[in-house]
Amino acid sequence: WFHGNLSGKEAEKLILERGKNGSFLVRESQSKPGDFVLSVRTDDKVTHVMIRWQDKKYDVGGGESFATLSELIEHYKRHPMVETCGTVVHLRQPFNATRITAAGINARVEQLVKGGFWEEFESLQQDSRDTFSRHEGYKDENRLKNRYHDHTRVKLQDVERSAPGAEYINANYIRLPTDGDLYNMSSSSESLNSTVAACPACTAAQTQRNCPNCHLLNKTCVKCAVKSATLPTNCATCNRKSDSLSKHKRSESMSASANASAAGTGPGTPTAAGNTSAAAALNGCLAVLLKKHCGDASPPPSTTSSCSGPLTGSLLNGEGNQFKTYIATQGCLANTKTDFWNMIWQENTRVIVMTTKEIERGKTKCERYWPDEGQCKQFGHAKVHCIKENSTNDYTLREFLFSWRDKPERRIYHYHFQVWPDHGVPADPGCVLNFLQDVNTKQSSLAQAGEKPGPICVHCSAGIGRTGTFIVIDMILDQIVRNGLDTEIDIQRTIQMVRSQRSGMVQTEAQYKFVYYAVQHYIQTLIARKRAEEQSLQVGREYTNIKYTGEIGNDSQRSPLPPAISNLSLVSCKSAVAEPLTAAAAAAAVAANAGNKHAAKLQPPLPPLGASNNNNSSGNSGSYCNSSSSTSTAQHNGVVSSSNNCSSGSGSANSSNANGNGNILGNGSNMRKSNFYSDSLAALKLQQQQLHDAATAAAAAALASAAAPAATTTAASASAAAAAAAAAKYKNIPKDMNSLRQPHAAYVAAAPALPPPPTPPRKT
């Protein structure tokens, strides 16, 4: 129910459009930073109640005070407030927010597992109405090729212009939202169509959601069912309005692009200049979306500027320079192989991602558009030579030498993911995360080598389900890598933005769940890996078996933690949510996090979620752990009581099948390109050292007690000093080794001295 930085108008709009009587949310106060506002829908209007923060307590301007916001909300759920006019303010159901901090992914997944996935996905489906034109796809010559949006489609340049539909291909540019886009997003329950005024018929359909009979029956009543049956399913009036709006925005962006090109400010591109309109159209689309997110506010300059060349990840102007661009396309048909390779050459794509098998369940999902290893094949003007092919448990990597119209060859890397099941989604998100890391590593290495690779081309069969799932996961992970675990992520809104560029992306509820599980798995891995590095520093040795493979067959390459994660302190994470910052501490935090706009945002001191933030994904084990040792398997029962989603426990050396009971990291050994291990020898040495220290302390205490009465004070001082030294000595022991820690020296004094360890047999 906590929506962070949300304005009062946005809160009213959300609750009135999507909520029902009794729906409530809590947001940060816009007028008084540090305070919060409780917004409740009562009798089809919204009541705002100020929540004050003073003397380290929360109150609503009188009455009882509470240590946390959660306690205040629970209290007023049981004891409703009464307005001065006599209206009772009932807090019946929270209006859930989908925008969360990355570190809070476990709590969000746990909440959705209880029944919220279906509701959230259905809300996404209802918000995905057509707001952009598809006129090109409806033409007779293109009807069998594509049904997707016009403003982001890829246009082929090197074709016969006389043939109708020759420049048309089933492919769309997908751009990662800039940081400005994400920062200006309002709560994800807001409809994407808020700027398009609906006709009376659609307005009537919208009001049916607030029918009290439907709410009472928990289903559509007969009256609403009859009324909805008479309404148009695809309103022409709304479509005309949205088409004219999108045309207006596209014309603005294209004129801006033309001005930039005339001024000579655009970057040079390796592809045809005809794609300028496509890039400008997509920027115009994102400007429309951003305006919808921000209300009437103008979008940041980085999102309104158009690029003067084709839309590639390394060629976008402004803030977009940091981010990748993808091409989502359909799997090749028998008559589209030449068009596919034409697009690959035109866009200077060097990495192709294929997420489907050629045949699944007896049906052809994608025609083979490449030759066998060592063979060369011609596809129209395209000549493709497969020079190498390597396979892993999850995917096959092929290397092609590709030329178009006998021009100089380019090296293409074809990543063919082959373990996606015919039904549903993979049981282990780790295999997908490993795959994405290898793909991104290759794309980055090409950019560092100065080859200026174009967009990554991703396709499955239809180019929307698995393709959208892979792209959305990669977008979210890139955001976390850039901004750290304190960044705000919104999976639902990210999918909405991707669907605005190619409709239907992330097609099923199972795929929607999988996006959450994959992001959760990745965040758990970052925390576990960071914690492993901290433990290695505390114990004073390096984890030599944690390896990070950058590509196939190269285990010597290590990838460091992202800077946003390596600077993270797990200890500070625990205290950051425990109590609010003072003014001095807040100023220090702002200074320490300069350049990170998310770090300075105020958050309510919510109570620790404790062991309730368990990982609810099922059986995440497998290829996400690349083991380099096969000596032991650890079973750990780590319990976490803090809200920073950190684990306490060791991992497994020979596989990722460690049992984590009550462990917030789920399968605690799972981590990206690495896994933990149980150092039994080191643990035994540490235990023996602790036993020896305890025996020494006990002997010293016994000698002190046997001394003269005059030395009682001295003995007490020595005992206290020994206790303090012991406490300091064990202060930095990791939680998963607390079981090896001995009791306080004061309690050991009365215990009998432990016998020395047996002498090992002499070797002969």
Swiss-Prot record:
Belongs to the protein-tyrosine phosphatase family. Non-receptor class subfamily. Residues 255-273, 612-666 have a biased composition (Low complexity). One of its GO terms (biological process) is neuron development. One of its GO terms (cellular component) is cytoplasm. Residues 117-522 form the Tyrosine-protein phosphatase domain. The keyword 4Fe-4S does not apply. Substrate binds at residues 422, 460-466, 507. This is Tyrosine-protein phosphatase corkscrew. It comes from Drosophila virilis (Fruit fly). The lineage of its organism: Eukaryota, Metazoa, Ecdysozoa, Arthropoda, Hexapoda. The active site is at 460 (phosphocysteine intermediate). Keywords: Cytoplasm, Developmental protein, Hydrolase, Protein phosphatase, SH2 domain.
